[in-house]
Amino acid sequence: MIKPSKIFRIFYPSLLWQMPKTGKKCIYLTFDDGPHPLITPKVLEILRKYNAKATFFCIGNNVNKYPETFELIKREGHSIGSHTFNHENGWKTKTDDYVKSFQASNELIHSDLFRPPHGKIKRSQLKKLKTLNLKNDFQLSTFNFQLKIVAWTVIAYDWDHALSPEDVYQNVIRNANDGAIVAFHDSIKAYNNMISALPRVLEYYSQKGFIFKSL
């Protein structure tokens, strides 16, 4: 399912599925499962060539292991978000444990953006996350904010080894239009497909006058 079904959107209306149109044609690239010290810098290099900004949904344990790579993402001017601490599947995780995983990750990441791994989250988890006061929970004393839970408009399926880089490229360009949130992965599993498809996606939309912004 490259694009989420209408039923899924109806069931989770509070998730961010697509960005509103702003008058400038825009694609919102996102990358899940990093940071990775060998892969993420290559993604950043490609984005830099196209003056593209993106959003990286980072796993807390990876941030803990690779803090230099995490800091590099921020220095390059990209947005960051949490992707739990150990990539927990919400449908298979108790609500309290899921929330604790988010809290552990965001103690390192400090962001108001969160994407559920696999896109799987229980309504009880969603409700509890939405009620968190991040100022109190994470000592972000300068301001107070509510968590934004981000889904996607199009998922590239770059991690699927049954697909070729061409398949991944076509998945994106056939389905992503103005305001689309596109999900890639800066992970070992997705590397071969992602690293081949991403520059082509950037080139395709650049030629059509799109810009690439972070969330």
List each language-model region with its residue ranges.
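Active-site beta->alpha N-cap acidic-glycine motif
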Residues: 2-91, 97, 110-111, 211
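Catalytic domains of cell-wall/extracellular-matrix polysaccharide-remodeling enzymes
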Residues: 64-65, 85-211, 215
